[in-house]
């Protein structure tokens, strides 16, 4: 029996949110297990690219009777912190920073490629060609201020996360993984959310009040994700990748 689209979307949005978080973190874990640090590089690139592509997909979740506006991109983007923290924990600060740099340049490359593709006129052979062209136009038509702000938020917050995680690890002599994982991520996400929200106000007609409301909702869920990924990072802490010569 086929499940209609409306039946799928009538499922609990809160359950779908949790499933997506577990899927995102689980994917990063599998990439690490089979490909080592290179798999985590891929996880970071996927997180930043897919997170930005789906940043405009906003849903409403009801938690304890309160409504929260949550971006789909925020879920995928938050998973990046799990990957960089795992890289930092297993391979060191240099490898974590390399993953951040790869994600930054990959995001620019995807954006430039989308812009180049829009220079080609869609064929009139089928109606779908125009539909795809218009869809790509929507994705690639963010204002320069929004793009610059998004990249800036990513780069600054991720660099801080890598540095602070390593600093806490040194300070605690390698103890209290839960502390450095959560504290570095929560503070870094606050930096990212602040820069991103400031960009929204500049690049759109969104009021400061609405921007703050959305930012607060996103930040609360980012904290939830940080708490969830603590379980994953402890689960994989003593797990070695299947590939050899992974150092």
What are these regions (language model features)?
Residues 18-33, 161:
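N-terminal signal-anchor/start-transfer transmembrane helix
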Residues 7-20, 67-79:
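Structural signature of hydrophobic alpha-helical transmembrane segments
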Residues 117-145:
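Membrane-interface interhelical connector segments
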Residues 101, 105-127, 154, 158:
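Transmembrane alpha-helix/helix-exit interface in multi-pass inner-membrane proteins
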Residues 137-145, 149-157, 167-172, 180, ...:
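Membrane-embedded alpha-helical bundles of multi-pass transporters/translocases
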